[in-house]
């Protein structure tokens, strides 16, 4: 999937750019309040941007991400969320690098929340400098080898913000545990763990196991 596919589906995206102008334009979603989206990645899996086009991707250097967050606020965003492609694959605990990055980002008035992805498994959430940090959400649309425990589990975050006189606070942070169905069972489905456990649907033993894994 590429940027044009996301555009066609009317899905906002950040972190990569096709032009310098696109790279310099803050990504803002308007739905009542205006939400700014800032993304960065630790690397490109061995690839490099085209020569002379370093702007084509955004790294996770803290000052760089804070500068982008400040630009989003200046462009009118009420709330700015930073997504950092960071961490260690298949490890359920945050790395020192993730923690240090979160400390830097949440110390900035321009950043209101941080979430990380890359580990492909669920990692802890915490509150830092009064702001929510999600170190790992697991998987949502990626189905990996069953030899990697936990990669079929994930969470959907639901965060409630309150904005008063331009000041942002986090009122509530909740998670919805999910389980990715096996491709051996037919079309891949996303299962809402709590809902299906209550209704008696699906593989109850596996759903219960996922619920316990995610909540620990």
Where are these regions (language model features)?
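Acidic, metal/ion-coordinating pockets
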Residues: 2-216
């Amino acid at each position: 999937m590429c940027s044009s596919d996301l555009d066609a589906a009317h899905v906002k995206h950040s972190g990569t750019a096709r032009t310098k102008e696109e790279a310099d334009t803050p990504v803002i979603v308007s739905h009542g309040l205006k939400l700014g989206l800032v993304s960065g990645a630790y690397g490109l899996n061995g690839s490099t941007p085209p020569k002379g086009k370093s702007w084509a991707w955004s790294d996770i250097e803290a000052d760089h991400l804070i500068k982008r967050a400040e630009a989003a606020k200046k462009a009118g965003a009420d709330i700015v969320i930073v997504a950092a492609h960071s961490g260690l694959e298949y490890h359920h605990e945050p790395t020192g690098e993730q923690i240090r990055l979160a400390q830097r980002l949440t110390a900035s008035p321009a950043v209101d929340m941080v979430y990380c992805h890359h580990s492909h498994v669920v990692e802890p959430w915490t509150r830092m400098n009064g702001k929510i940090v999600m170190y790992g959400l697991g998987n949502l649309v990626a189905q990996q080898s069953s030899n990697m425990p936990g990669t079929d589990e994930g969470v959907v975050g639901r965060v409630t913000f309150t904005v008063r006189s331009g000041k942002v606070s986090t009122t509530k942070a909740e998670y919805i545990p999910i389980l990715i169905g096996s491709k051996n069972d037919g079309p891949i489905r996303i299962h809402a763990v709590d809902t299906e456990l209550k209704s008696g649907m699906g593989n109850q033993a596996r759903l219960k196991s996922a619920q316990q894994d995610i909540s620990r």
